[in-house]
């Protein structure tokens, strides 16, 4: 954990001036990696590591009052790397999240917090969890923040992920995990 915090501090300390924050008509491009472990509510003893690419469209100007003030963004994620470390095997897979609903709160200095709901599909070489199916769906919720920099931003978030085959196979116990995700990206404004 100390190493992770040291890397985050080093990565964010190289940014001196603030870049464009999420704005209506702007776009987000990001590469990210994350990982975590299963929690109660499904099959346990499973670790998850994943990495992907994001493209987002900021659709609205700022609205709502007070601390809720922010902008709505729609995003898609391509996930070329997905590993599920299960007690009996390691499943390798790919995923695609075509539904990313993100609320970018009003920025405070270089910090731009956000909430996100995401949904998509996961295809693996082994059943996830074991004895179920190789085709699954992913529902996710995340709370994070962008640290805006001169050329790029660093994103850090806490993500809850539910993986389930949605009844395509029986049984359908699913896997629930809590993950930490780190991303490096850029917001492009309307005029970039």
Predicted features and spans:
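Bacterial N-terminal signal peptides
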Residues: 3-14
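Short glycine/proline- and aromatic-enriched beta-strand/turn motifs that initiate or cap beta-hairpins
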Residues: 16-60, 172, 177-192
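Short loop/turn motifs that connect adjacent beta-strands in outer-membrane beta-barrel proteins
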Residues: 19-26, 60-72, 106-112, 148-154, ...
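Residues that define the transmembrane beta-barrel architecture of outer-membrane proteins
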Residues: 25-27, 45-51, 90-97, 111, ...
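Transmembrane beta-barrel strands of outer-membrane/channel proteins
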Residues: 27-37, 74-82, 115-121, 156-162
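Residues on the lipid-exposed face of transmembrane beta-strands in outer-membrane beta-barrel proteins
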Residues: 31-35, 51-57, 98-105, 117-121, ...
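Extracellular loop and loop/strand-boundary signature of outer-membrane beta-barrel proteins
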Residues: 39-41, 86-88, 125-131, 166-172
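Gram-negative (and chloroplast) outer-membrane scaffold detector with strong preference
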Residues: 51-125
């Amino acid at each position: 954990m100390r190493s992770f915090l040291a890397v985050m501090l080093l990565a964010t300390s190289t940014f001196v001036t603030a870049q464009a924050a999420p704005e209506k008509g702007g776009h987000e491009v990001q590469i990210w990696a994350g990982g975590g472990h299963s929690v109660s509510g499904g099959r346990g003893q499973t670790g998850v590591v994943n990495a992907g690419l994001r493209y987002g469209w900021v659709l609205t100007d700022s609205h709502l009052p007070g601390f809720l003030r922010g902008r709505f963004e729609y995003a898609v994620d391509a996930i070329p790397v997905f590993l599920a470390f299960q007690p009996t095997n390691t499943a390798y897979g790919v995923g695609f999240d075509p539904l990313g609903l993100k609320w970018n709160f009003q920025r405070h200095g270089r910090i731009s917090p956000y909430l996100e709901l995401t949904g998509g599909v996961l295809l693996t070489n082994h059943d996830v969890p074991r004895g179920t199916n190789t085709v699954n769906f992913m529902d996710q919720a995340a709370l994070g923040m962008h640290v805006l920099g001169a050329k790029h931003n660093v994103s850090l978030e806490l993500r809850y992920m539910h993986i389930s085959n949605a009844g395509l196979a029986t049984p359908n116990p699913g896997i629930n995990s809590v993950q930490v995700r780190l991303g490096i990206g850029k917001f492009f404004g309307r005029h970039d």
